[in-house]
A protein has these predicted regions:
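Extended hydrophobic leader/signal-anchor segments used for secretion and membrane insertion
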Residues: 15-18
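Short glycine-rich, flexible loops that bind phosphorylated cofactors or substrates
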Residues: 163-164
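Short aromatic-enriched loop/helix-cap "lid" or pocket-rim segments at secondary-structure transitions
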Residues: 167-169
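Membrane/wall-proximal cationic-aromatic binding patches
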Residues: 21-106
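C-terminal soluble interaction/assembly domains
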Residues: 101-160, 171-174
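Single conserved hydrophobic/aromatic residue that forms the stacking wall/gate
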Residues: 1-6, 10-11
Length: 174
């Protein structure tokens, strides 16, 4: 999937240096399947985060907005079971990735589950901002969000099992 999208955006493997971060990754499907004889997968990173800032946006118990800095790759998660949270620091209702190296680029909204998180670093060179909404946690108007944040393009990206079963996709129409 990532290579197909990359080929459409003129992203070449030679543009990146692969860094293997973990050779002991078992994902959600492994955890829920009961199949235990498969070998673990590898987690690699490809994109340096120079000029890239990541922030998670949530609300405190009084409804006030709270911004928490994050990273494209948070390697502290490599020492816990949920290694996939290394990408963008795990699940969050709203995340914003800003690219200081492309301030005039378009703004992308990704409506997604965590499946999209590993793709985001490959998209960062092409956008000034990437806004990530997880409809399991984000319940405000998406149309208002698009208008308030000058979104130019949108992408819906889910794993297939989540896409076909997620009842929260109804929030797209709000």
């Amino acid at each position: 999937g990532v290579r197909l999208v990359g080929s459409e955006m003129c992203i070449r493997d030679s543009d990146y240096t692969e860094t293997v971060r973990s050779t002991e990754f078992y994902g959600t499907v492994f955890s829920s399947s009961g199949v235990r004889w498969v070998r673990p997968d590898t987690i690699s990173t490809y994109v340096p985060d120079d000029g890239i800032t990541v922030a998670s946006h949530t609300y405190d118990n009084k409804g006030n907005p709270v911004e928490e800095p994050r990273q494209l790759y948070d390697t502290s998660f490599l020492s816990v079971k949920d290694k996939y949270s290394m990408f963008l620091g795990g699940n969050q209702p709203l995340g914003v990735v800003k690219n200081a190296n492309n301030p005039d680029g378009p703004r992308l909204l990704i409506i997604r589950d965590s499946y999209a998180d590993s793709l985001v670093p490959f998209l960062t060179p092409h956008f000034s901002e990437i806004h990530l909404l997880d409809l399991r946690y984000y319940k405000l108007s998406i149309a208002d969000y698009i208008a308030q944040n000058g979104i130019d393009q949108a992408l819906v990206l889910y794993s297939v099992p989540n896409f076909v079963t997620d009842s929260n996709l109804l929030w797209i129409a709000k």
